[in-house]
């Protein structure tokens, strides 16, 4: 488990692509030096910094990070409703860094863990496979490969799921 800072400078948000694609949903502040900064709306950039902080070998993979810290989102009124539209929340979040050939096995492991936890509480998971959006980062072939791996893992654990076309991130 890790804890990352609640505010990052503009440069990190630009590097991650969030400044261009998500800035309107972020709370923005200026440092005492006038430098633009963003209050953390997601954990991804901080986890990337942790991963790249030292030289790693493929033998170090999978490399797993988990965090439960407050996130803040400045979402427009009416976008979401009820408890799904809040300005501050704690997200139980994880990032797994893997090689391409570890994707399926790692996702399958996580799905089995999710199923065990849900079963322990007599809950039924609702699973959705969100596919490549119209505007996406990366290569189309990478998305196709990742989507195929995700679908294969869902089927391997006999999960009931729906496909959300174009809703991936």
Task: Specify the residue positions occupied by each region the protein language model found.
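TRNA-recognition modules of translation machinery and tRNA-sensing kinases, especially anticodon-binding
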Residues: 1-169
